[in-house]
């Protein structure tokens, strides 16, 4: 019983010094380490039994060094923990403050951007109102000080000095200089302006001494402060070129008499515009203008540019006619201007009639050659003239040809087949990209600070910058073996795939699930077609998307009714989906093609025959081709795009044959004239027909893609397209791009005009030295797809 009990809630019990064990009979003493400060302030121990215990309780508590150290360590640890909590809270609050500050700054930037857009829209709206008012009433709409909004800074807006009065000399000179600059940019120099004003002045019998300075100032102020700025009028030339050409129709009537042209020149131009052109005569070069006016050939040449004057005037005769105001300006619209200017309408009419008679009496004046003008218009690409009807271009070509033949300039030549170089931008770029492809602002493109003409002139050189780049979007993973064929629904974002696992699957690209660790989306099939007893090798969908056809290694063609794109994948079995079976082939069906014109189906088989079917008939097989295997075993088949009464079939011998579907006779044999001993390398894997041109394209086992003329049967181009066998081809609906797939695991997109590769995509992995089996374009949406031996189908957008 000599040991002491450790007390309190703190440090370990310690043996007391011998002087503390004075109680007789081994009574327990008090340990300062047990109930002292180091012990954590625990309650005192029981009193000792001996009488010596009483004096010990009256002594002060004693502290030990270990107990004190323990207490300090305990308090330090608590302090450190609280400080760590405080620092964490401070960091969280600082992060919260930074986030709120950033959010506030972002909201302020958004507000500034919206205010800027609102001001730009208000400015554009005022301009449109002024243009509409001028077109409808023939007078300028007074909107006060209409100017471009500025966005330098808020301080600049608040402290912006008021502009000078509009009638001040400085504003007048600056406006004249700005107008002259924009006229030079559109190719309308002072010399041409002076010649035209001199001609109109002499026509109307007016002298140079007429005091018209105030009228000139008024017209200039209308140009500067009215509905359109000179910059926008310069842009209007490019935008309304098709309307101007169609209005004046000067190309179609290239060989007509001079009377019609002069009538249009006199009656189609408002007197106010003529006055403005007369006033331009005050600007230098008067001697040169007089010399040029005396030359009748120069006058005739200058008349060719009347459409530029009208377009530069903005609201001239061309726009008035195109908007349905008749072939002449309404005299009621001109009467207020005539009254203000004190113009004698009777004198002008008399002078017009006299001038017409003089023009009828003129003989022997040779019309200027317009070939350069035609070439200039032809050089304008589709980016600058997107809305000119093709008929106008054809008329210009025919007019140019008539004039050239009349002059005996050159003999006729056979033109080579040219592929379209533009026009399919909406498919390749997408509808939203087309709206942004001009300048990125749509209708607000006119409100930029820089010169808009520079953008339009640079567009043809920068076409590649606006070309769409295809990126993988959807991955279709539910097949258990290689995907041999695929086809898009003609309207919906729906895809059908055919696989070696004996099934076809229907996919709705709008029903997606996120893929793991990938930017693409996985799509689950919404329906599985089961009827084949072997691998499915070929596929075709009807033009209305209501039926599809599949050919397999079991020598049958299954005819399916397409389920709804919103079908439930877990619905009960629907027997009506399988519409029928076309039986006739005796070996694997390797190719199918459907024509919606007569609802006919073509199939080619390893039995050596090509068959034409009408599934609606009781005897669906209409005709059989190559029954004697004269050309070999067919590998692929397609309808001729520009002549649906013909079809083209490729064979394993390396040749392709065009057949007449009615007579069953072979019309043209497309041969590349290679050594017949290399038959294995000359094997054609796929043949497609261009949708609009008489051109057939073939994909070969020897890595080549070849182009043939359907009329002559001659090869017009050949190129090494891939690093391995080319297995599949597809032409986009506009006939501008060609897509090819190969066993080198790549998809390549080709420009048919230049025969150059514009994009390469690595899409699939190899399986048994095979990779891509099929590629396809969607006929109405911006989708392309590929099918591979790795049991995957991929869709790109």
Swiss-Prot record:
Protein topology in the membrane: Peripheral membrane protein
Bias kind Gly residues: ranges: 1-13, 23-43
Effect of residue 530 to E: Decreased interaction with other components of STRIPAK core complex
Phosphoserine PTM sites in chain numbering: 202, 214, 229, 257, 335
Keywords attached to this entry: Acetylation, Calmodulin-binding, Coiled coil, Cytoplasm, Membrane, Phosphoprotein, Repeat, WD repeat
A GO CC term assigned to this protein in UniProt: neuronal cell body
Calmodulin-binding: region residues: 166-183
UniProt-annotated stretches for the region Disordered: 1-60, 224-278, 313-338
UniProt key word Transcription: no
Species classification: Eukaryota, Metazoa, Chordata, Craniata, Vertebrata
Family assignment from sequence similarity: Belongs to the WD repeat striatin family.
CDD domains found in the cross-reference section: WD40 (cd00200)
Subcellular location: Cytoplasm; Membrane
InterPro entries: G-protein_beta_WD-40_rep, Striatin_N, WD40/YVTN_repeat-like_dom_sf, WD40_repeat_CS, WD40_repeat_dom_sf, WD40_rpt, WD_repeat_striatin
Comp. bias regions, Basic and acidic residues: 230-241
Sequence ranges of Low complexity compositional bias: 44-56
Residue spans of biased composition, Acidic residues class: 253-265
Modified residues (N-acetylmethionine): 1
Phosphothreonine PTM sites in chain numbering: 150
Function comment: Calmodulin-binding scaffolding protein which is the center of the striatin-interacting phosphatase and kinase (STRIPAK) complexes. STRIPAK complexes have critical roles in protein (de)phosphorylation and are regulators of multiple signaling pathways including Hippo, MAPK, nuclear receptor and cytoskeleton remodeling. Different types of STRIPAK complexes are involved in a variety of biological processes such as cell growth, differentiation, apoptosis, metabolism and immune regulation.
GO molecular function, one term: calmodulin binding
Caveolin-binding, as annotated region: 71-79
WD repeats: 478-517, 531-570, 584-623, 679-718, 721-760, 767-797
Record-given protein name: Striatin-3
């Amino acid at each position: 019983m000599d040991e002491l009990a450790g007390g309190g809630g703190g440090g370990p019990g310690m043996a007391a010094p011998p002087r503390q064990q004075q109680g007789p009979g081994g009574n327990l003493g008090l340990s300062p380490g047990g109930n002292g400060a180091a012990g954590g302030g625990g309650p005192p121990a029981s009193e000792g039994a001996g009488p010596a215990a009483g004096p010990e309780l009256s002594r002060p508590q004693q502290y030990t060094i270990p107990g004190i150290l323990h207490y300090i360590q305990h308090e330090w640890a608590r302090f450190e923990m609280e400080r760590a909590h405080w620092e964490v809270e401070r960091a969280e609050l600082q992060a919260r403050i930074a986030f709120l500050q950033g959010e506030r700054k972002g909201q302020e930037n958004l507000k500034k951007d919206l205010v800027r857009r609102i001001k730009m829209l208000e400015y554009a709206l005022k301009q449109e109102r002024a243009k509409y008012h001028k077109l409808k009433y023939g007078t300028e709409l007074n909107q006060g000080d209409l100017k471009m909004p500025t966005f330098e800074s808020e301080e600049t807006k608040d402290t912006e000095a008021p502009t000078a009065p509009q009638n001040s000399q400085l504003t007048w000179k600056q406006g004249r200089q700005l107008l002259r600059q924009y006229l030079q940019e559109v190719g309308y120099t002072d010399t041409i302006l002076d010649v035209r004003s001199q001609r109109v002045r002499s026509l109307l019998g007016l002298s140079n001494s007429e005091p018209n300075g105030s009228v000139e100032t008024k017209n200039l102020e209308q140009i500067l402060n009215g509905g359109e700025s000179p910059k926008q009028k310069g842009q209007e030339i490019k935008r309304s070129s098709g309307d101007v050409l169609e209005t004046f129709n000067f190309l179609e009537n290239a060989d007509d008499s001079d009377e019609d042209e002069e009538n249009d020149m006199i009656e189609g131009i408002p007197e106010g515009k003529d006055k403005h052109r007369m006033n331009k005569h005050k600007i230098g070069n008067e001697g040169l203008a007089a010399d040029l006016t005396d030359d009748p050939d120069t006058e005739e040449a200058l008349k060719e540019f009347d459409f530029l004057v009208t377009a530069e005037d903005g609201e001239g005769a061309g726009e008035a006619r195109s908007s349905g105001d008749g072939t002449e300006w309404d005299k009621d619209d001109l009467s207020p201007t005539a009254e203000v200017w004190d113009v004698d309408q009777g004198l002008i009419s008399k002078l017009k009639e006299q001038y017409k008679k003089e023009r009828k009496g003129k003989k022997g004046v040779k019309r200027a050659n317009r070939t350069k003008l035609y070439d200039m218009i032809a050089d304008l690409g589709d980016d600058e003239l997107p809305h000119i009807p093709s008929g106008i271009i054809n008329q210009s070509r025919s007019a140019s040809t008539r004039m050239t033949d009349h002059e005996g300039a050159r003999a006729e030549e056979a033109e080579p087949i040219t592929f379209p170089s533009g026009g399919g931008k909406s498919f390749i770029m997408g509808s939203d990209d087309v709206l942004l492809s001009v300048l990125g602002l749509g209708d607000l493109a006119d409100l930029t600070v820089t010169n808009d003409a520079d953008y339009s002139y640079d567009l043809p050189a920068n076409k590649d910058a606006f070309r769409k780049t295809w990126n993988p979007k959807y991955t279709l993973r539910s097949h258990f073996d290689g995907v041999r064929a695929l086809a898009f629904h003609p309207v919906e974002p729906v895809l059908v795939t055919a696989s070696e696992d004996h099934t076809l699957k229907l996919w709705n690209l709008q029903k997606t699930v996120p893929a793991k660790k990938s930017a693409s989306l996985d799509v689950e099939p919404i329906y599985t077609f089961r009827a084949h007893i072997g691998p499915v090798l070929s596929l075709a969908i009807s033009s209305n998307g209501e039926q599809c056809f599949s050919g397999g290694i079991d020598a049958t063609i299954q005819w399916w009714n397409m389920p709804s794109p919103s079908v439930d994948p877990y619905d009960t079995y629907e027997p009506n989906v399988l519409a029928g079976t076309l039986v006739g082939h005796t070996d694997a069906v390797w190719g199918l093609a459907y024509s919606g014109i007569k609802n006919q189906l073509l199939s080619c088989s390893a039995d050596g025959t090509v068959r034409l079917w009408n599934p609606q008939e009781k005897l669906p097989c209409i005709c059989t081709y190559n029954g004697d295997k004269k050309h070999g075993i067919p590998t692929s088949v397609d309808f001729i795009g520009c002549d649906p009464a013909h079809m083209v079939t490729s064979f394993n011998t390396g040749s392709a044959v065009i057949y007449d579907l009615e007579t069953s006779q072979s019309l043209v044999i497309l041969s590349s004239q290679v050594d017949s001993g290399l038959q294995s390398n000359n094997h054609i894997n796929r043949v497609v027909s261009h949708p609009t041109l008489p051109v057939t394209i073939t994909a070969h086992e020897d890595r080549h893609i070849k182009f043939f003329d359907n009329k002559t049967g001659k090869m017009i181009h050949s190129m090494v397209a891939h690093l391995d066998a080319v297995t599949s081809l597809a032409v986009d609906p506009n006939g501008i791009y060609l897509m090819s797939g190969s066993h080198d695991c790549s998809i390549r997109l080709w420009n048919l005009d230049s025969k150059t590769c514009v994009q390469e995509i690595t899409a699939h992995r190899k399986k048994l030295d095979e990779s891509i089996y099929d590629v396809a374009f969607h006929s109405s949406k911006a989708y392309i797809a590929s099918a591979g031996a790795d049991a995957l189908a991929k869709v790109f957008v």
